[in-house]
Amino acid sequence: MSVTNSNRKRSLSEVSEGSDPEAPAKTRNSYTTDEIVMVEEVDSEIPVNISSYGDAETYLKWQNTIAKVVKSVVSIHFSQVAPFDSDNAVVSQATGFVVDASLGIILTNRHVVGPGPFVGYAVFDNHEECDVTPIYRDPVHDFGFLKFDPTKIKYMNIQALELKPSLAKVGSEIRVVGNDAGEKLSILSGFISRLDRNAPDYGELTYNDFNTEYIQAAAAASGGSSGSPVVNSDGYAVALQAGGSTEASTDFFLPLDRILRALKCLQSNKPITRGTIQLQWLLKPFDECRRLGLTADRESQARAQFPDKIGLLVAETILREGPSDIKIKEGDTLISINGELISSFIQVDDILDESIGKEIEIIIQRGGIEHTVKCEVGDLHSITPDRYVEVCGATFHELSYQMARFYGMPVRGVFISSASGSFNIDANERVGWIVDSIDNKETPNLDTFIEVMKTIPDRQRVTLRYHHLTDQHTIHVTSIYIDRHWCSEFRLYKRNDVTGIWDYENVAEPIKAEELKPHAAKFIDIPIDIPEIATLSHSLCMVSTVSAIPLDSLPVENVKTSGLVIDAEQGYIIVSRRAVPHDCLDVFVTFADSVMIPASIVFLHPTKNYAIIKYDINLVNANIITPKLSNTPMKRGDRTRFIGFTHNNRLVTSETSVTDISSISIPSNIIPRYRATNLEAISIDCNVSTKCNSGILTDNDGTIRALWLSFLGERQDNKDKIYLMSLDITDCKEVIELLKEGKKPKVSIIDAGFGAISILTARIRGVPEEWIKKMELQSENRLQFISVSRVSFTEEPVKLQTGDVILAVNDKLVTEMSQLDGVVSTADDEESQTLRFKVVREGKIIDLNIKTIYVKETSQIAVFSGSILQPPHHAVWQSMMNIPSGVYCTFRGESSPALQFGISATNFITHVNETETPDLDTFLKVIKQIPDNTYCKMRLMTFDNVPFAISLKTNYHYFPTTELKKNIESGKWIENELNKTEEKKIIKSD
């Protein structure tokens, strides 16, 4: 099971020939759901300023035309389900229009239909809705066709727009009728200014049209108008809206010539043939053609033959190993094909599309010399991917002609369209990678790649060789971890142009992980003259984790940090909870940069930001040493030695001193997730420590005094903020001792937030002078009181209130935060503890009996319609005054029905089809009764307790309902795909 996240909206620079190189950025005009602030439904009868039409007759003509056209225009709400080729997985809106009412054919853009899986529906002018499925997307040009069932539209007569490409003329007044900027209907006016511009270039690693003229006009269309008809005053479609400038009112329309041919093929049930010689032409003006070697005779002939043309086609990019490779060179001017003089892209397309498998004769001029070459025309569809593979959480397909053309490379290779999961090779670049080999086996094509992946066992580490399209000179080599348990699917998807669905087959079941063998490792002492310090390298290791599921709203990432061995005989290691936030992940320990072995999670502290893991001591043969742990808390002014790991995993050391020990409050994230609370952090005067994300503080005799840990904080500017602080080892000692005794520890806590306040503040709040004197007499480190900063919502209400000043617990004066850590016990202890609190509230001393609670880690999640649902985790209880439901959304996929229909992270689902869903089990029972591709009503509650309702359409083919549940006794996670089979699969064992 894997989850992807992506975003489609982009602004790109145009650099195509014939335009100003400093031209403003361009964008395609599809509209992303996340960018909709408010959608207003605009009535077809739009008030119009008559003066803008020149006269009343023109106004009435346009008014009548628009009234007819809007009956053909539809708003398309769609999801491109999987990352494919140049397109991310995305939910968006666009426009289309009916071109055949009887067959139910809608014309829109290719970048709307997309090259990969598509799910969508169309909304007609009268707000009737029907599903649409792709029946054709052009391999190169920016158009595609969707099909709908005309019988589903009951309350209006469907009208088709007639395509008239010949009516597009310079100076013609036009209207763009569509879903502009997410509006239900917008009508934009303009005039055609050019018919012969080259296709706009939207930049690299994205879809670009080429080998066609584009029409230019000024209509100021924006996001959502993609696929809109460009109509004249007679109501004919003369072009198709495709893109435009983000900084000017310039729009780009696709001519309808090749679209009309494709439509006729569909109407007559004939294949839409598309030929290619794998060459990109650009239209260049005659003066530039002359500079490239066009002779005067040929120029005169062309000007006479095509008096309305301003230039000829010139070879721009010739793909290596293609039919025209070597025969045609960049800068060659095209004269004729098969004896026909050529002046436009339309002529070239017409010849190539009818000549697949045949040889054509091409005359070009190069440096004033005429050359005749012969090329065999290939099938453009054959070099356009129509299948992809999902394995190890990533997606792969053959390199497309679209991508190969942009970079001038052969159309071959395995393209990673989503570098995630095991193939998360660069967190900043998810697309554009080519797999050269894996497990030391070359992968020249997708079939070979599939066969190689079949042979690799689960949990194996293999070598990956790869490069990026933007830098073909640099070959990267790395080792990757094959995950076939969390990301268990190995599926081959293939496009079905009859149904519009991408059918899939399961390629292979995971091969069981190989049995691990023990290895020896040699430690290098720390280069220091103090033997007790030098050998501490034998007690340190690197801990790395691999996560695949955004449990508890925590990031899906691979984290590496250092750990400290606390018991070498039993294999216990203490590590930051930043690396081990939950147990729905894989943990590995590396000793001496030599031996890596798996580890299991045995303890997660609910508030102190540390975890304890365990490794098999029989798998590593090395001199691992259990260090001495201090029993004395650190104090301000203590001298100590910092030992830490830099970002490149190098050990560094420095003498330092403790500058402060104070209570720290880590800011909460806007989406609640685990953070350390009620901390007293140790600050040190050491520049080296700021360069290390993990380490220890030690005495000169090697006694461990504190852990240097990384703490996950809030998310800002799309980045997680990480705090670096020291945690006194005595705060962990009680738990460590229980583990050494062979007992399983657990911690019950006072579920409230605390912070330090000064004596002055305490006096103002009403703390009596006698208690202030007690504090002054007994406090050794800092004169402070502890106050309640917040109280969590719990099943049994906490009697503390925000603002309470804590005087004593169990009759002992509270001077430090550590006195409120809660109670450490063993797993055998069923009952939580009750503590006697004495507090000052509103100037009065009161006594309270406060019951501690055990924090439950998440042990069940469900994936429904692309959303991750689970019981509210502890951070949610900490952040809210009440919990509306036990079904909490912690994440939603960027191409999912959850996003499309309005489920957001931090929403609670309270009802499904008016059935209350108080917990996840009830929710799953209700969902199992809902058929595929049907709407269900959901009532939800926002994080701020605002109720709302949505209707959501299920899609179990691409978004099945899956449950992951942990057996608390065995520690095994079980995956169950509810919509497909009742077969249960164990995917991880602790």
From Swiss-Prot:
Residues 73-263 are annotated as: Serine protease. Signal peptide: none annotated. Its EC number is 3.4.21.-. Pfam families: PDZ_1, Trypsin_2. Keywords: Apoptosis, Hydrolase, Nucleus, Protease, Repeat, Serine protease. GO terms for biological process: apoptotic process; cellular response to heat; lipid metabolic process; stress-induced homeostatically regulated protein degradation pathway. Disulfide bonds: none annotated. Coiled coil: none annotated. One of its GO terms (cellular component) is nucleus. Its main location: nucleus. Residues 1-32 are annotated as: Disordered. The active site is at residues 111, 142, 225. InterPro entries: PDZ, PDZ-like_dom, PDZ_sf, Peptidase_S1_PA, Peptidase_S1_PA_chymotrypsin, Peptidase_S1C. SUPFAM superfamilies: PDZ domain-like, Trypsin-like serine proteases. It is an enzyme of class 3 (hydrolase). It is found in: Nucleus. One of its GO terms (molecular function) is serine-type endopeptidase activity. The keyword Protease applies. Residues 290-368, 758-843 form the PDZ domain. Belongs to the peptidase S1C family. Nuclear serine protease which mediates apoptosis. This is Pro-apoptotic serine protease NMA111. The gene is NMA111.
